[in-house]
């Protein structure tokens, strides 16, 4: 059934938590450069991908649904460091100076607002550009005012808030996360052990009718309290943890093994990474949050309860090592021990020398544009159709997450078809 989608009129504010970080600045530079014809938005589904229509015609996704034009985006956000986007991008050393200079004026105009930050949630970071708030509730109120002020100052019709900041320490789901009333009480009581800064950003965004995207593996909007609030406010939420490198490869390879009914004995994964994200993950408490996210992938694809002979005893290990000389150029190694006909063993080795932020930047942009589309289409709560972009896709307690990349891609296209009242094409015709 065709949905009524409000047109993408006016300007869209994109407020990024961690706007001075490597992923954020890479996304911003690429978007601005694309607007000026200085670069192509390679890796962006919203800008380059096509989908087949009911009549078997192939169309660009951006021609099928009314996405916000890149020219209508206004960037802003928060950071614990005061550097403008040009200075921050120079520090990150992801992009060449000549690429930054093409949009230097626009980058220098993007100056971060003081961040809502608690050192206890990211002990390896020591920022100075930080809000002073007596309670988590006061922190929320300050963030809400920031959103309102940015929207007014930049004449934005709509806003999306994107978390592209560091991974917070691991915490389990607790009673304070189980209902909106309990969450708000914990914020007002300043329960800093269970209410993270990222939860304050998410609450503030939803309260201001802004879709929220969680790009890290933090426990944040994947709680009953946030589900309740997002449905109450009719706001989309999505995440979590950008699926950009090693885990992307896993969600391609694991479905292949399962489709061919090849068994797996073990999967060992390790990485070296030298950017600020790697530095934060060098702390065991922060790494555990990431580890849980990365480990969750293959079980739901393999379904060992259905195929115990093939996947009933898979040894899965994930490691991330902070190695400053590599900076943003992450290297990932995977050793996969598989077995085939009559149980004979084989091995697959994958060595992925990737650029972390180059892979994550288009994911961040696509999640922003699709979240804005979902808001205009009246879709609220968890956006499971955006699982394609995430390591640890959000889901409620009644459902399992979908990790198979190809099934996830079909979910994206089918959701877009449903929005415009299109049927899936007949691939047998």
UniProtKB/Swiss-Prot annotation:
Family membership: Belongs to the myo-inositol 1-phosphate synthase family.
Localization (cell): Membrane
Cofactor requirements of the protein: NAD(+)
Free-text function comment from the UniProt entry: Key enzyme in myo-inositol biosynthesis pathway that catalyzes the conversion of glucose 6-phosphate to 1D-myo-inositol 3-phosphate in a NAD-dependent manner.
The keyword Lipid biosynthesis belongs to this UniProt entry's keyword annotation: yes
Annotated TM spans: 12-32
One GO CC term on file: membrane
GO terms, biological process: inositol biosynthetic process; phospholipid biosynthetic process
Catalytic activity annotation: D-glucose 6-phosphate = 1D-myo-inositol 3-phosphate
Name recorded for this polypeptide: Inositol-3-phosphate synthase 1
Taxon lineage: Bacteria, Pseudomonadati, Bacteroidota, Bacteroidia, Bacteroidales
Annotated residues for binding of NAD(+): 22-23, 79, 116, 165, 167, 201, 244, 276-277, 290
Matching SUPFAM superfamilies: Glyceraldehyde-3-phosphate dehydrogenase-like, C-terminal domain, NAD(P)-binding Rossmann-fold domains
Gene Ontology molecular function terms on file: inositol-3-phosphate synthase activity
Bilayer topology: Single-pass membrane protein
Subunit structure: Homotetramer.
Entry keyword annotation includes Kinase: no
Pathway assigned to this chain's UniProt record: Polyol metabolism; myo-inositol biosynthesis; myo-inositol from D-glucose 6-phosphate: step 1/2
EC number: 5.5.1.4
Gene ablation phenotype (knockout): Phosphatidylinositol dihydroceramide (PI-DHC) and phosphatidylinositol diacylglycerol (PI-DAG) are absent, phosphoceramide (IPC) levels are severely reduced and ceramide levels are increased. Inositol absent from capsular glycosyl residues. Abnormal capsule morphology. Results in a mild growth defect. Sensitive to cathelicidin LL-37. Abnormal RNA level of genes involved in capsule biosynthesis. Does not appear to affect production of outer membrane vesicles (OMVs) or OMV cargo selection.
Enzyme class, UniProt record, top EC level: isomerase
Keywords: Inositol biosynthesis, Isomerase, Lipid biosynthesis, Lipid metabolism, Membrane, NAD, Phospholipid biosynthesis, Phospholipid metabolism, Transmembrane, Transmembrane helix
InterPro entries assigned to the protein according to its UniProt record, in alphabetical order: Myo-inos-1-P_Synthase (IPR002587), Myo-inos-1-P_Synthase_GAPDH (IPR013021), NAD(P)-bd_dom_sf (IPR036291)
